[in-house]
Amino acid sequence: MGYRKLGRTSSQRKAMLRDLATDLIINERIETTEARAKEVRKAVEKMITLGKRGDLHARRQAAAFIRRELVTTTDAEGNETTSFALQKLFDDVAPRYAERQGGYTRILKVGPRRGDGAPVVVIELV
């Protein structure tokens, strides 16, 4: 299976993909370069599939990849709840895609970045 090097060492690349995947799960929409988005899509699709499985082994596999970041959500009544990104993945994100067989993300092109002309995209959960 091929992958993009993204101009980084393997440990730097893995850390960046973990950060981007965690941010995408928390915010459900991030802006990044096209190459990074295509790589993070692979990781997030695997994490959502693990979330759909929902067993202990899947939770531990996802916990090894997803960062332990706090997520603050507000419900319709204005009550704030705090949980971890992993909990949001298993309790909120994955159940939305119970009937869907893959294709959990969408990549929309934004245009070139002003500084270096790199193609910028928005990756979001469908």
Swiss-Prot record:
It comes from the Bacteria. One of its GO terms (biological process) is translation. InterPro entries: Ribosomal_bL17, Ribosomal_bL17_CS, Ribosomal_bL17_sf. The keyword Ribosomal protein applies. Signal peptide: none annotated. HAMAP family: Ribosomal_bL17. This is Large ribosomal subunit protein bL17. It comes from Lysinibacillus sphaericus (strain C3-41). The gene is rplQ.
